[in-house]
Amino acid sequence: MSRSGVAVADESIQAFNDLKLGMKYKFVLFSLNDAKTEIVVKETSSDPSYDAFLEKLPENDCLYAVYDFEYQISESEGKRSKIVFFTWSPDTASVRPKMVYASSKDALKRALNGVAIEIQGTDFSEVSYEAVLEKVSRGAGSH
């Protein structure tokens, strides 16, 4: 239960585990139910295109997402993968949803074990492939 009193639906945890363990999905979108009492699965996708993920982010509404982000630092190191947690709260969204999503985020994050990186997006430049790549690769290869 979050500070806002919002709970995380079991289906949300299951969808995340299907992404993380079963590699069933490439990304999962989460939203608040109509009563604003529970974080539920809005959509799942196995589409490997990052652009397909970005197209699902609404211009005027908030949501959460997890994305199995694959990247490569150098040819010699091969591909890597990190699970990225997004809080999408565009500047154009109404104030009330932004407040509810901000205060409910920790409940969802706590329920999703295995998230490597968190990204807060208020516009598309903050969630671009390049911006996410920079964040996930920071420190990688320096171990």
From Swiss-Prot:
Keyword Ribosomal protein found: no
GO cellular component, one term: cytosol
Keywords (A to Z) from UniProt: Actin-binding, Cell cycle, Cell division, Cytoplasm, Cytoskeleton, Nucleus
Annotated GO MF terms: actin filament binding
Pfam families per record: Cofilin_ADF (PF00241)
InterPro entries with a match to the protein in the record: ADF-H, ADF-H/Gelsolin-like_dom_sf, ADF/Cofilin
Protein localization: Cytoplasm; Cytoplasm, Cytoskeleton; Nucleus matrix
Signal peptide: none
Location of the ADF-H domain: 5-137
Any one GO biological process: endocytosis
Function description: Controls reversibly actin polymerization and depolymerization in a pH-sensitive manner. It has the ability to bind G- and F-actin in a 1:1 ratio of cofilin to actin. Binding to F-actin is regulated by tropomyosin. It is the major component of intranuclear and cytoplasmic actin rods. Required for accumulation of actin at the cell division site via depolymerizing actin at the cell ends. In association with myosin II has a role in the assembly of the contractile ring via severing actin filaments. Involved in the maintenance of the contractile ring once formed.
Family: Belongs to the actin-binding proteins ADF family.
Protein name: Cofilin
Gene: COF1
